[in-house]
A protein has these predicted regions:
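Conserved class I S-adenosyl-L-methionine
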Residues: 113-121
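A short acidic, Gly/Pro-enriched loop at the edge of an enzyme's catalytic core
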Residues: 172-182
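N-terminal accessory regions of S-adenosyl-L-methionine
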Residues: 1-96, 227-228, 271-289, 302-308
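A short glycine-rich, Lys/Arg-flanked "PGG" loop and its adjoining helix->strand segment in the class I
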Residues: 195-210
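Short alpha-helix
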Residues: 239-255
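A short SAM/SAH-binding and catalytic strip from SAM-dependent methyltransferases
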Residues: 180-194
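Short, glycine-/aromatic-enriched active-site segment of Class I SAM-dependent methyltransferases
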Residues: 216-238
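Conserved SAM-binding loop of SAM-dependent methyltransferases across substrates and taxa
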Residues: 122-133
């Protein structure tokens, strides 16, 4: 049985070698990642709770527990999570469960849906989508560290309903496959051409499909968008941070209408922070110590928002 479609199945032809899931990708770390994955102990009678988190429980001896923790720690930094594998708790930089809870408030039904998750990171959200009984999820994530993390976690979960390609949407050779729901979370403000990004996402929707955008929104004082022309909240490659009006106008130009949206939520040190599993600079270095609603570049601190869109009929 094909994964979503014959066309999707063919995308994985270069990644079918069980001894090298990285296909033709070039990176000096790949050999180490392959070795790490081959050494990962298995869990006997493993069971996964993907509804309340990404929680995996199974039988293994004490020494294997430590091996699992040590091997997973070699895949730093863990940006998205958390994950719990028996006694190993991966306390990621982002408490992604908080964003997921905000998504659930939109009451979007994922049951038996085919989903495209663009810029999926290590697959945390895809696992949570599976917990909501999604039919199949295609993840696109060009970052090979995140791709390796997904491969490691899925060695325990062993689902074939989620598959990840280390590719970008814009370069993907896919024309005839369309999805019930397409996700783009935390990507729009990194696009040099946000119109093209929305158009690429729209082109992957079924006629009655829904597009979920999660992004940073700027205050209305900036007109259509804030253009940092440099780092924003210590993030490089932030090109346009749209206002609510600016995003609505952009979506309309691309043949999309907003059917629902969430309230704006300001990022906090509780949601994004430095941890043992992401020991580098984090949000605490992105905002002023005395005024956490102001970035170190003197912009308003990030506020994030969900939009659900459909094609104009």
């Amino acid at each position: 049985m094909n994964f979503i479609s014959i066309e999707c199945e063919e995308l994985f032809l270069d990644y079918m070698n069980p001894n090298n899931p990285f296909g033709q990708k070039k990176d000096k770390r790949i050999e180490n990642w392959i070795s790490l994955l081959s050494k990962m102990p298995s869990l006997e009678n493993a069971k996964s709770d993907l509804l309340s988190g990404v929680i995996i429980k199974g039988k293994c001896n004490g020494s294997d527990e430590k091996v699992i923790e040590n091997l997973l720690s070699e895949l730093l930094p863990w940006r998205k999570g958390p994950f719990k594998i028996n006694n190993t708790f991966i306390d990621s930089e982002w408490r992604s469960n908080l964003k997921w809870d905000r998504f659930l408030e939109l009451n979007l039904d994922l049951k038996e849906k085919t989903i495209l998750d663009v810029g999926s990171g290590n697959g945390y959200y895809a696992f949570r989508m599976l917990g909501q009984e999604a039919k199949a999820i295609l993840c696109l994530e060009p970052n090979l560290v995140h791709f390796s993390q997904f491969l490691a976690i899925n060695q325990f979960i062993k689902t074939n309903k989620i598959r990840m390609l280390p590719e970008r949407l814009e370069t993907l050779e896919i024309k005839d496959t369309h999805f019930d729901i397409v996700f783009s979370m935390g990507l729009l403000y990194h696009q040099r051409d946000p119109s093209n990004h929305l158009n690429c996402l729209r082109n992957r929707l079924k006629e009655e499909g829904q597009l979920v955008i999660e992004t940073i929104v700027a205050s209305n004082e900036y007109g259509d968008y804030l253009e940092p022309k440099g780092p924003y909240a210590s993030m490089p490659n932030v090109h346009f941070v749209h206002t609510n009006k600016g995003f609505m106008d952009l979506a309309e130009k691309e043949g999309l209408k907003v059917i629902s949206n969430s309230t704006e939520v300001q990022t906090t040190l509780n949601e994004q922070r430095q941890t043992k599993w992401m020991p580098f600079k984090s949000y605490e270095s992105a905002v002023l110590e005395t005024h956490q609603d102001i970035t170190v570049e003197n912009f308003p601190a990030p506020k994030r928002k969900f939009y659900v869109l459909e094609k104009f009929s």
